[in-house]
Amino acid sequence: MFSLASRRALVSGAGAPGGIGIAIAKTLKDLGAEVFITSTTDRIHERAKEIGVTGLVADLTIESDCEALIAKVGSIDILVNNAGMTSQNDPLGADEASDLTGVTLEAWQRGMKRNLDTAFNLTKCALPALRKSKSGRIIMVSSVTGGLMAMSHQPVYAAAKAAMLGLMRSLALDEAKYGITCNAILPGWIETDTQSAHEKLQGMKTPLARNGRPEEIAGLVGWLASESSGYMTGQTLIVDGGNSIQEERAQ
């Protein structure tokens, strides 16, 4: 029931070698899917070659790029919206890391483009193909930040990630008649190549006293992409080591 043989998957935000996106792509491939990954730079071809999938360059903030991407991929059964990042990982995003009074409209729009418009554009362009699948899967990789909690000086990122959940629920309702399910995963502190020392320390304060691994997010994506998850839609799955259930945190 976990086999994805004969299924075709598109995963966004898979450019970082130690990131969640590449772990998702590898898991889907291992389950038998034909996998396409996308990022904004040519390094996506290196990532794709490493795990034996197809890499395509696209700027998902531009609708025409998304249209061209979908045209290249063709039929799609599984869409994983993983593109996005916090402002600290974007060289242009320093003015997003502020309380709301310090956030310019330009900074707000940039953060929304990076973390919300990418999912909107790609999903909109992929829907005709997903509807033809008859059992399509849309999986949003959001965050506990915004989706469940908040972080000081990250109003743009939190708002965008929370908005992904509203989009997910609307899609779950509207696309059910086509056999499409849509769900979201909310990762907590995950150890990736771009994780800061502060983030790594926070992960050690969870009840499980460690950071999560990209493969632990990828495994859940694999299940959501499979036949076994067919009766689940419009739901959020929290993967944070129990961090959100504790009232007191270790010092």
Question: Could you say what each language-model-derived stretch is?
Answer:
Residues S135, A176, T181, M232-G234:
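Short, small/polar-rich loop/turn modules that mediate ligand/substrate recognition or access, typified
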Residues R110-K132, A172-L173, K177, S226:
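Amphipathic alpha-helical dimer-interface segment in Rossmann-like NAD(P)H-dependent oxidoreductases
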Residues G222, T233-Q251:
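Short C-terminal tail/terminal secondary-structure segment
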Residues F2-F36:
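Canonical Rossmann dinucleotide-binding motif of NAD(H)/NADP(H)-dependent dehydrogenases/reductases
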